[in-house]
Amino acid sequence: KFAGAQLAKKGIVLSNDTAAKTVSETAPEAEDGSGNAGIKKLAETMPPNETPGWQYSSSGWWYATDATTYYVNGWADIDGNQYHFDSNGYMATGWKAIGGKGCYFDDQGVYQPDRNGSMMVALTFDDGPGVYTSTLLDTLEQYGAQATFFMLGSNVEKYGADVIPRMAAIGCELGNHSYAHPNMKELSTDDGLAQFQMTDDLIAQYNNGQGATVIRFPYGNSTDELLASIGRPSIMWDVDTLDWQTKNVQANISAVLDSVSPGDIILMHDIHETTVESCATIVPELINRGYELVTIHTLAAANGVDLAAGETYYGFHGGTTNE
């Protein structure tokens, strides 16, 4: 992972003086993680680190400040580079919202302050997967683009095994759009939750036991009680292509390219052949215009927004993100 590092017990030996240090516990400088990292004692069940420094577990990289403590919830300067550690002590990579600011960390966790996330949009696809989803994934993969798929459980049963592992492999985000697309305002809260739970269980079969990270209510309709109980962010949109209505390739292309702006969440449906065909033009043209096509979580983080369960988001435009 790091130049000159020596891998041992899934840990990494860094600077020679690290092992000699004894470090006192300190609280993080800021509760939201925007200040200097705190230093926390390892749980009593954890063995002491024979070699403090970078360590690895199945959840990610973390840094042992001495044999029994580690960095947590904030920034740390290590060997001249800036890193950020979350509330569990794991090192950040990619885009993270920290103190209301989007911060980018490379694959080795090093903060890259010059990375610009201002030209991003999120393509989102509802009601799939379907017979055309694999072709859409071909297009996304060809151009190094990601999207977020809000899937119906009834279609996951039919097509999930073929496409969900591939979605995850190319960096797409998995969303939940209910099992059968009912109007949630016509259901009880328990019945609405059951719609999403069924779909999560189906998605998890093809995603290492993990369900969706975001949800979208069918027709955009919900009740306050269901929204408060859903346990994840609710994602709406600010560009509706009406692809389900027009079913016309050129109309889809125009609907996106004539109105797109940074921070947009674009609504489409991968169950329609015309939609997937139009994406063969839309995706490379957006990239040609300088846009990055990213997932919902990445778009939010790059705009300094930490998505919250039970909140609804329409797009990310300099603070106008949710209602």
Feature map (PLM): residue ranges:
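Extracellular adhesion/carbohydrate-binding repeat motifs centered on closely spaced tryptophans
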Residues: 1-118
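Glycine-centered loop/turn motifs
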Residues: 73-74, 93-94, 263, 305-311
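Active-site beta->alpha N-cap acidic-glycine motif
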Residues: 109-185, 191-198, 202-204, 211-212, ...
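Active-site-proximal beta-strand/loop segments in catalytic clefts of secreted hydrolases
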Residues: 125-128, 150-154, 178-179, 215-220, ...
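C-terminal domain-boundary segment and adjacent tail
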Residues: 142-143, 156-157, 274-323
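Residue-level detector of anion-binding/catalytic polar loops
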Residues: 146, 173, 233, 240, ...
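Alpha-helical scaffold elements lining the catalytic groove of polysaccharide deacetylases
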Residues: 162, 182-207, 221-264, 275-278
